[in-house]
Amino acid sequence: MAQIHHCVTLLLILCCSGLCGAIQWLGLTVNGSRVAWNESGHCRLLDGLVPEQSQLCKRNLELMQSVVNAAKQAKLTCQMTFSDMRWNCSSVENAPNFTPDLSKGTRESAFVYALASATLSHTIARACASGELPTCSCGATPAEVPGTGFRWGGCGDNLHYGLNMGSAFVDAPMKSSKSGGTQATKMINLHNNAVGRQVLMDSLETKCKCHGVSGSCSVKTCWKGLQDLPHIANELKSKYLGATKVIHRQTGTRRQLVPRELDIRPVRESELVYLVSSPDYCAKNPKLGSYGTQDRVCNKTSVGSDSCNLMCCGRGYNAYTETIVERCQCKYYYCCYVVCKKCERTVERYVCK
């Protein structure tokens, strides 16, 4: 019996290594933050990287601090984006040892893959523009003719370099011959990575700075810049809510992903996809990667996902009061400072039973 249990455990580990291993680099916030990144030997110290990622690390040591920064940003942004949902992305902090919510091809893992992919390319593109990387600089001057009243200038985010280096790093586990996992899981991971990068590309916009006497803005200098990560994460959250469950089946001479409920069409390049349905995340169940919602803060007056009715799954909630101190009765004095008083206010909070 013990031997059977050992075999089942080993099988689960092997399956997970092919699926969740592709985002194990998010665990670099644990061991990568303490590395100086000045020797190629440092790349061997990192857990969770496939050989191809280790080689990228050795060839691009200067890039690795951006990778660590991206891992931090991806975790933080995910938790902020889902703070009002039953699944609040808290499990991403377990990286590189993920729970089933992020290791079984779920809707949640689709979001995290897409966000992580977008975040790394975003971080690298911004690092180029800020002069943090010696291997790249500002983005290329746009080919389009500038409009009336503005000229191209400034230092735009280097999206081209960010996409090239970011995709090479995050897609490596799915393309590695030494990684485990099924062809289906590799395909959905690559697909969701690409969706994240597409949302990032779509966020590129023209940003401008005014020049002129007394702020008249007679001339504007403009450049192409990416929107901030919270905007990109919210776009991906919309895709998460409308994600498509897929199957991996033979179509003609090759296997491809098709929607499970509507398999008459191929999967759209713009939609997130997943293989396994998620639990409702109401009750704590480690086997499903659910932390439950007991003791989660809820909003009594909301009708959205953070409402006490939805967040608490109908179990009810407890109320308590809290005294907060905040600035009040602020006055501006010429010139140039503000003086405020401190006021106490009692607020009522609600937590799920």
Swiss-Prot record:
Glycosylation is required for protein secretion. Its main location: secreted. Residues 1-22 form the signal peptide. The modification Sulfotyrosine is found at Y274, Y281. Glycans are attached at N31, N38, N88, N299. GO terms for cellular component: extracellular region. InterPro entries: Wnt, Wnt_C, Wnt_CS. Disulfide bonds join C78-C89, C128-C136, C138-C155, C208-C222, C210-C217, C282-C313, C298-C308, C312-C352, C328-C343, C330-C340, C335-C336. A lipid is attached at S214 (O-palmitoleoyl serine). It is found in: Secreted, Extracellular space, Extracellular matrix. Coiled coil: none annotated. GO terms for molecular function: signaling receptor binding. GO terms for biological process: gastrulation; Wnt signaling pathway. Keywords: Developmental protein, Disulfide bond, Extracellular matrix, Gastrulation, Glycoprotein, Lipoprotein, Secreted, Signal, Sulfation, Wnt signaling pathway. Xenopus and other lower vertebrates contain duplicated wnt11 genes (wnt11 and wnt11b) resulting from an ancient gene duplication event, but the second copy has since been lost in mammals. In addition, X.tropicalis has two very similar wnt11b genes suggesting a further recent duplication event. Belongs to the Wnt family. Ligand for the frizzled7 transmembrane receptor. Primarily acts via non-canonical Wnt pathways mediated by either Ca(2+) and PKC, or by JNK and dvl2/dsh. Depending on the cellular context, can also signal via the canonical Wnt pathway mediated by beta-catenin and dvl2/dsh. May also inhibit canonical Wnt signaling. Maternally initiates dorsal/ventral axis formation by a canonical route, which signals via lrp6. In a complex with wnt5a, activates the canonical and non-canonical processes involved in axis formation. Homodimer. Secreted homodimers form a complex with wnt5a homodimers; tyrosine sulfation of both wnt11 and wnt5a by tpst1 is required for this interaction. Interacts with the transmembrane receptor fzd7/fz7. Interacts with lrp6 and ryk. Interacts with tdgf1/frl1. Interacts weakly with frzb1 and strongly with frzb2/crescent. Interaction with frzb2/crescent antagonizes wnt11 function in the neuroectoderm, but enhances it in mesodermal tissue. This is Protein Wnt-11b-1. The gene is wnt11b-1.
